[in-house]
Amino acid sequence: MKRHFETTRRIVIKVGTSSLVQTSGKINLSKIDHLAFVISSLMNRGMEVILVSSGAMGFGLDILKMDKRPQEISQQQAVSSVGQVAMMSLYSQIFSHYQTHVSQILLTRDVVVFPESLQNVTNSFESLLSMGILPIVNENDAVSVDEMDHKTKFGDNDRLSAVVAKITKADLLIMLSDIDGLFDKNPNIYDDAVLRSHVSEITDDIIKSAGGAGSKFGTGGMLSKIKSAQMVFDNNGQMILMNGANPRDILKVLDGHNIGTYFAQGK
């Protein structure tokens, strides 16, 4: 199926920790530079881009020379707080090589639930984009909680990216993953797994293949991505799920190349 993005102007790109931090725990500088080049190239074409970036914990562990994530929530939040500063500092440095200015927006769920604060953050996005600035969004891990009477966490940045796409009325959400897209079953286990090129509806079969009950596909956080795709559908949007190994593939996708899985209703 031919994909047409000629009229796409506003894009949300979500990048996960696995695309920013190597398995050794070291920061993947080359990958971040490639991503900065691609995003800057899109902005130079006149597109508006919002980057939703995980990685605060990974950066914090690297900075603090810690081998593994701490168990205590307060310590996790402290490490993420340190990592967020380091991550934004690196983003600012690398994007400056391409004359791209960046900003930071840290969100909690209550900000987008209450109408007044939602309007404020919406205005902030619009102002930044109108000024040609790249908003870099993450959850405010240092203060987010998930208590029954005061839930402020989004859950993960897959969901956050779908929320950002909704409130900014983005034309397209591009979700970079460590897998090529949505398969009919786990490709790490089954050699005959088939990549789904196009998904027009989130069916029970797709939910099962992505990690639901009785699934063959139990790893990789794919279910969270499918739930995010449903949120995109609910807002009449479209989404690409693709491998983030080579960020320059984003340019190919926008040129219509059949890369990853394209989530679009009735297309």
From Swiss-Prot:
Listed InterPro entries: AceGlu_kinase-like_sf, Asp/Glu/Uridylate_kinase, G5K_ProB, Glu/AcGlu_kinase, Glu_5kinase, Glu_5kinase/COase_Synthase, Glutamate_5-kinase_CS
Cell location: Cytoplasm
Alphabetical keyword list: Amino-acid biosynthesis, ATP-binding, Cytoplasm, Kinase, Nucleotide-binding, Proline biosynthesis, Transferase
Recorded coiled-coil stretches: none
Pathway connected to this protein: Amino-acid biosynthesis; L-proline biosynthesis; L-glutamate 5-semialdehyde from L-glutamate: step 1/2
Organism: Streptococcus agalactiae serotype V (strain ATCC BAA-611 / 2603 V/R)
Gene this chain is encoded by: proB
PROSITE patterns (alphabetical): GLUTAMATE_5_KINASE
Protein name (Swiss-Prot/TrEMBL): Glutamate 5-kinase
GO BP annotation list: L-proline biosynthetic process
CC annotations in GO: cytosol
HAMAP family given in the database record: ProB
Chief localization: cytoplasm
NCBIfam families xrefs: proB (TIGR01027)
GO MF: ATP binding; glutamate 5-kinase activity
Residues binding substrate: S54, D141, N157
EC number: 2.7.2.11
Domain of life the protein comes from: Bacteria
Catalytic activity: L-glutamate + ATP = L-glutamyl 5-phosphate + ADP
Function: Catalyzes the transfer of a phosphate group to glutamate to form L-glutamate 5-phosphate.
PANTHER family hit by this protein: GLUTAMATE 5-KINASE, ISOPENTENYL PHOSPHATE KINASE
